[in-house]
From Swiss-Prot:
Its main location: secreted. One of its GO terms (cellular component) is extracellular space. Belongs to the urotensin-2 family. The keyword Signal applies. Residues 20-106 form a propeptide. Disulfide bonds join C115-C120. The gene is UTS2. Residues 1-19 form the signal peptide. This is Urotensin-2. GO terms for biological process: blood vessel diameter maintenance; regulation of blood pressure. It holds the Pfam family Urotensin_II. Keywords: Cleavage on pair of basic residues, Disulfide bond, Hormone, Secreted, Signal. Highly potent vasoconstrictor.
Length: 121
C-alpha cells in the first residue's frame, strides 16, 4: 500500500506532462539561431584573440615572430581593453605555422613483423 501512493502520484504527473502540446521542430527553425555573417565574424574574432594569447615559440627566428611583425591594427573594446587584430592575411596561416614547429617528428619503430595494426610489441 505504501508503494501504491507514490506510483499513482507519478502516473498523475506523467499524464499531465503528456497532455502538453509538443511543437513540430521540423516546421519551424530554432528562434535563437544567429545569422551566418554574425557567426563568421565571431569565429574571426576568436581566431584573432587565440593568436594573441599564444606564447612565443622557442627557437623561432626573429623575423618570423608574431609579436615583432606588426601586421595588424589596434581594436578598442567597450571595457577599455585594447587588442590587436590581424589584417590582410588569414589567422589560420599563422596558427598552422606555429603548430608545425611544435609537432613532434614521426618515429618509426622496429621491423613490421613486430607490429600488428597500430600496436607494436
Amino acid at each position: 500500500m505504501s508503494k501504491l501512493v507514490p506510483c499513482l502520484l507519478l502516473l498523475g504527473c506523467l499524464g499531465l506532462l503528456f497532455a502538453l502540446p509538443v511543437p513540430d521542430s521540423r516546421k519551424e527553425p530554432l528562434p535563437f539561431s544567429a545569422p551566418e555573417d554574425v557567426r563568421s565574424a565571431w569565429d574571426e574574432l576568436e581566431r584573432a584573440s587565440l593568436l594573441q594569447m599564444l606564447p612565443e615559440t622557442p627557437g623561432a627566428e626573429a623575423g618570423e615572430d608574431l609579436r615583432e611583425a606588426d601586421a595588424g591594427m589596434d581594436i578598442f573594446y567597450p571595457r577599455g581593453e585594447m587588442r590587436k587584430a590581424f589584417s590582410g592575411q588569414d589567422p589560420n596561416i599563422f596558427l598552422s605555422h606555429l603548430l608545425a614547429r611544435i609537432k613532434k617528428p614521426y618515429k618509426k619503430r622496429g621491423p613490421p613483423s613486430e607490429c600488428f595494426w597500430k600496436y607494436c610489441v
